[in-house]
Design a protein with these regions (language model features):
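Conserved phosphate/metal-binding and DNA-contacting active-site motifs used
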Residues: 22-170
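BZIP DNA-binding basic region
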Residues: 1-22
Length: 170
């Protein structure tokens, strides 16, 4: 049985490799922004959500910069289940649910991604493994849900996105 080292940065070689690969994939523009936090899975109203946390484990907010940190600090922290990015400062995100099936991008998702008018910064597979995040250059404005039979959300501020660093190759 492996013993967890409470002050270790990584608990296994696989964890170290994932962190290194994520750092290589996440664009420098996002890594340099002090808009990072941790998140944990939590139940709310019978639904699993991703609750934002500070690197110390306190509640964080997607609208309170005092609860955000650097990419390096968020990546080093072992609090919760992963890292998240607070949208804003010209960085927005399209969140496409159920866009992947067995690792294959659905035709509707590919068509939508190819039609995105804003410059794309970074594309990744979401935490569920079935969704897609498309980080974009965007001016701040209200979020919106694009239905068209699919669940597509676009946010530019006031939200955070759980970041996996698992690059989506189109």
């Amino acid at each position: 049985m492996a013993i967890r080292r409470p002050h270790a940065r990584f608990y296994s070689p696989a964890c170290r490799v994932r962190a290194h690969r994520a750092a290589e994939v996440i664009p420098e523009r996002m890594r340099k922004a002090d808009r990072w936090m941790r998140w944990t899975l939590a139940e709310r109203n019978g639904k699993t959500t991703k609750r934002p946390l500070t690197v110390e484990g306190r509640s964080a907010s997607s609208t309170d910069p005092a609860t955000w940190t650097t990419y390096a600090a968020a990546s080093r922290s072992t609090v919760g289940n992963g890292i998240g990015f607070a949208l804003g400062e010209g960085i927005g995100c399209y969140d496409l649910d159920d866009a992947l099936s067995d690792g294959t991008l659905a035709d509707w998702a590919r068509e939508f991604i190819e039609s995105i008018p804003e410059p794309v910064i970074f594309s990744e597979v979401s935490q569920s493994g079935n969704g897609v995040h498309i980080f974009i250059e965007a001016t701040e404005g209200p979020g919106r849900v694009i239905r068209d039979g699919r669940k597509i959300e676009r946010y530019t501020a006031g939200r955070y996105i759980a970041v996996t660093g698992v690059r989506l190759t189109l």
